[in-house]
UniProtKB/Swiss-Prot annotation:
Regions crossing the membrane: none
Cellular compartments per GO CC: small ribosomal subunit
Quaternary structure note: Part of the 30S ribosomal subunit. Contacts proteins S8 and S17. May interact with IF1 in the 30S initiation complex.
Gene behind the chain: rpsL
Full protein name: Small ribosomal subunit protein uS12
Residue numbers spanned by region Disordered: 101-123
GO terms (BP aspect): translation
């Protein structure tokens, strides 16, 4: 425990909270252009081909973003919207693409949890 005299000479340091999504720069989403669309494999206990894309954002950052849902229409030069949210079993993937906005189509034949995948209500 510090004495009052010590605290007068040197006050306690404020802890600065570090952002989980620095490339967004305090914005809810960011627009960017796909520079590469590819699949990658997850960490140890899991096995799959996860769809990801490398995105050059409007603020100059280049980030890796996960493409959720079954099937997608993204290719190089597609314009996408990026939101925060990491993928636990893909190291270095800290962003998600927003389905159903800009060049990203919604998930086809999606019946439940549609709003997260940009799917319209079935007739």
């Amino acid at each position: 425990m510090a004495t009052i005299n010590q605290l007068v000479r040197q006050p306690r340091k404020r802890l600065v909270e570090k952002s989980d999504v620095p490339a967004l720069q305090n914005c809810p989403q960011r627009r960017g252009v796909c520079t590469r669309v590819y699949t990658t494999t997850p960490k140890k206990p899991n096995s799959a081909l996860r769809k990801v894309c490398r995105v050059r954002l409007t603020n100059g950052y280049e980030v890796t973003s996960y493409i959720g849902g079954e099937g997608h229409n993204l290719q190089e030069h597609s314009v996408v919207l990026i939101r925060g949210g990491r993928v636990k079993d893909l190291p270095g993937v800290r962003y998600h693409t927003v389905r159903g906005s800009l060049d990203t189509s919604g998930v086809k034949d999606r019946k439940q949890g549609r709003s997260k995948y940009g799917a319209k209500r079935p007739k």
